[in-house]
């Protein structure tokens, strides 16, 4: 494996019609090295309270829930993963990144379902 770990981020786009909520993540892609602190942001087009969840997905695997309701930890998920935010602005933080954290990360809202 190369010295730098590649972490991919997905941009989630929901058509903004009839009050539907658009989630925008940044950055789209980031190349980082082990032990770095990584921050991923997710912005909602309107307030969703704390109804924001973070997922990790590795190739050929199903998405894994990392954080629920903005900041609630999930049993079995390493403590280096944490979430914060409310309303429209949310953050996923990975402290002291490890090689096994190379994956796609994305946010999902449950405030308004199709």
UniProtKB/Swiss-Prot annotation:
Assembly notes: Immunoglobulins are composed of two identical heavy chains and two identical light chains; disulfide-linked.
Keyword tags: Adaptive immunity, Cell membrane, Disulfide bond, Immunity, Immunoglobulin, Immunoglobulin domain, Membrane, Secreted, Signal
Region (Complementarity-determining-3): 108-114
Positions of region (Complementarity-determining-2): 69-75
Presence of keyword Membrane: yes
Signal peptide: 1-19
GO terms, biological process: adaptive immune response; immune response
Superkingdom field: Eukaryota
Location in or out of the cell: Secreted; Cell membrane
Any one annotated GO CC term: plasma membrane
InterPro entries listed in its UniProt record: Ig-like_dom, Ig-like_dom_sf, Ig-like_fold, Ig_sub, Ig_V-set, IgV_Light_Chain
Protein's UniProt name: Immunoglobulin kappa variable 6D-21
Residue span of region Framework-3: 76-107
Domain Ig-like: 20-114
Positions of region (Framework-1): 20-42
Framework-2, as annotated region: 54-68
Complementarity-determining-1 as annotated region, ranges: 43-53
Pfam families linked: V-set
Function: V region of the variable domain of immunoglobulin light chains that participates in the antigen recognition. Immunoglobulins, also known as antibodies, are membrane-bound or secreted glycoproteins produced by B lymphocytes. In the recognition phase of humoral immunity, the membrane-bound immunoglobulins serve as receptors which, upon binding of a specific antigen, trigger the clonal expansion and differentiation of B lymphocytes into immunoglobulins-secreting plasma cells.
